[in-house]
Structure formats: structure tokens, C-alpha cells
């Protein structure tokens, strides 16, 4: 896992926004929600923005997380989605 300090900074459960930046494609938001659903089932309404040139999309989804390990796992799995450049 990652060596983070989320457990020192957050009181769990906590609302945590994940922003995923990836190559522009219609299914990126669906792929992000599918990964989140596997670990934290719920009803998610991601927001999407295209870059100024339209080459990239950023998808933001707020997730209620229950542990630092859950945050770290989501960072790892979201980064593994095809075409993803960054997870913030």
C-alpha cells in the first residue's frame, strides 16, 4: 500500500473527492464509477469537465470512505484505468 497520513488528517467515515484525469473518451466516467462501486457501493453522480483542447476529461466523484486503506486502494485502482493520467 501507499505510505499516506490520511488517518492523521481525516475522521472516518469521511466524504472524500477523487479527481481522475484521463484521455477524453465517453466511457471514462462509467469506468471511474465502476471502480468506486466495487469498493464503496452507492449512488454516485460524477461531474465531468473537458480540457480546453478536448484531449482530456477530468471526472470528480465524492466517496464516503471508511479508512485510509480504502482511500489508498481507490487511488491505486483508479490509476489503473486505461487512459488515466492522474488521480488527485
UniProtKB/Swiss-Prot annotation:
Instruction: Quote a single Gene Ontology cellular component term.
Output: cytosol
Quote the protein name from its UniProt record.
Answer: UPF0250 protein Shew_2940
Which PANTHER family has this protein been placed in? UPF0250 PROTEIN YBED
Entry-linked HAMAP family: UPF0250
Q: Where does the signal sequence lie? A: none
Q: Which InterPro entries match?
A: UPF0250_YbeD-like, YbeD-like_sf
List the taxonomic lineage: Bacteria, Pseudomonadati, Pseudomonadota, Gammaproteobacteria, Alteromonadales
- Spell out the coiled coil positions from the record: none
Q: Would you identify the family this protein belongs to, as annotated?
A: Belongs to the UPF0250 family.
- Organism of provenance: Shewanella loihica (strain ATCC BAA-1088 / PV-4)
Amino acid at each position: 500500500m501507499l505510505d499516506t497520513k490520511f488517518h492523521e488528517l481525516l475522521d472516518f467515515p469521511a466524504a472524500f473527492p477523487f479527481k481522475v484525469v484521463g484521455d477524453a473518451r465517453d466511457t471514462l466516467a462509467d469506468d471511474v464509477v465502476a471502480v468506486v462501486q466495487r469498493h464503496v457501493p452507492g449512488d454516485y453522480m460524477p461531474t465531468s469537465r473537458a480540457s480546453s483542447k478536448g484531449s482530456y476529461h477530468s471526472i470528480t466523484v465524492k466517496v464516503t470512505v471508511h479508512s485510509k486503506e480504502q482511500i489508498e486502494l481507490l487511488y491505486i485502482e483508479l490509476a489503473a484505468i486505461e487512459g488515466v493520467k492522474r488521480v488527485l
